[in-house]
Amino acid sequence: MNRRDFILKTTGVAAASLSYSQLYAQIQKQVEPTSNQANYDVIVLGVGSMGASTCYHLAKRGFKVLGLEQFDIPHELGSHAGQSRIIRKAYGEGSDYVPLMERAYQNWQALESETGSQVYYKTGLAYFGAPDDPFLSTVLGSSKKYNIPVNNLTVEECDRKYPQFKLPQNFQRLEEPEAGFITPERSILLYVQQAIFNGAVIRTKEKVLEWRHETSGSVTVVTDRGTYKAGKLVITAGPWAAKVMPSLASKLTVTRQAVAWVKPKKWDDFTLGKFPCWILENKEYDFYGFPILPVGTFGGPLGLKLALHYPGADTTDPDFVNRKTKESDEKILIEFLNRFIPDGYENTLVMKTCLYTNTPDHNFIIDYLSEYDKDVVFATGFSGHGFKFVSVVGEILADMAMNGSTPLPIGFLNAKRFDKAGI
């Protein structure tokens, strides 16, 4: 039995019936402990969220792909962990993202169809904020420009539909019915599974020591376990991007973020099906959260998840992050819950940290490293709002690496936009 048939027999579309822990265990068996092959069409440096999707899109097109990940897949040391990520189309960060988001929805649905496993859950998304809030204004602008359904709820309608929230009378109350959440760890595992099924080699716990562009136009990657060559290199290194690409260091800042899972006073009122995903804009701080999810399906932790979206938080080095949360991290979330979701807090169950890789304008960077022609392509700087785009970023990077361009509209995300500002 060949490798492809073995993988199909042992996993195939059976992912639909697997719990998160079962899927995780199966994927670990498929990851290559060793590889005698040294030459590839393309090497993907970093197999987190964007890298997993890229490996899949490249392998599905028939290219010889090597994915290198310094940690396990998935892991909790970067930006992709944490059980759930909001997905939405009426984009408050700018309407230029909407065409990419529409393609991302299509690609998420394609992954579900291929694997028989659900990754997108439509819960609806509630947006709350002041009448003049710029983020909500852009949400409405994106909705109007691209005909995305967004409901403007009255106070009475909101109180009936979302009685868990206690909001100022003058707050805007918006609802995007088609929004919801994506399961990050399951999505990454499924992309890795499908990449391997299509012939990719994925190696974990293998740290890249250096990479170099040869005069011949090829790329050499040296790790702590081997040396590999390829015609193209894709860098999706998350918070480690500036360490792998020092020329981008002035454009990237890594910050430490805190996420909480809490026990609400009325547990049943906050479970999946009774409570939405939500975003609340409150002048200096932006908060977001999710319903309580069953850990058997989604993995842990268990509890009502919420976090502060604050790209200007503590800067850090990804190799030396203080993973212990501070009292102030918890305090601001408790104060928020007591003010806006009165029954949402009884006690804290779990606090975790994750990392943002921020750009000066908080928009992504997807481009070529200009000094290497088009042999090295990268994606970075997702600034805390990137995971929903994983399914389309992988497609874009595959296009750029192997075709020299992508038909998808990413001109606003190129690195050259910072040159005018001298960054």
Mark where each language-model region is.
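Active-site substrate-recognition segment that forms the wall
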Residues: 56-60, 118-121, 227, 239-374
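N-terminal export signals
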Residues: 5-27
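C-terminal catalytic lobe of FAD-dependent flavoproteins
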Residues: 339-423
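Core beta-strand elements of the Rossmann-like FAD/NAD(P) dinucleotide-binding domain
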Residues: 38-40, 223-232
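Dinucleotide-binding Rossmann-like beta1-alpha1 core, especially the glycine-rich loop
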Residues: 84-161, 170, 286-287
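Glycine-rich FAD pyrophosphate-binding loop
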Residues: 60-79
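Flavin (FAD/FMN) cofactor-binding and adjacent substrate-gating region
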Residues: 132-198, 203-204, 210-217
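Short hydrophobic core segments
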Residues: 45, 228-239
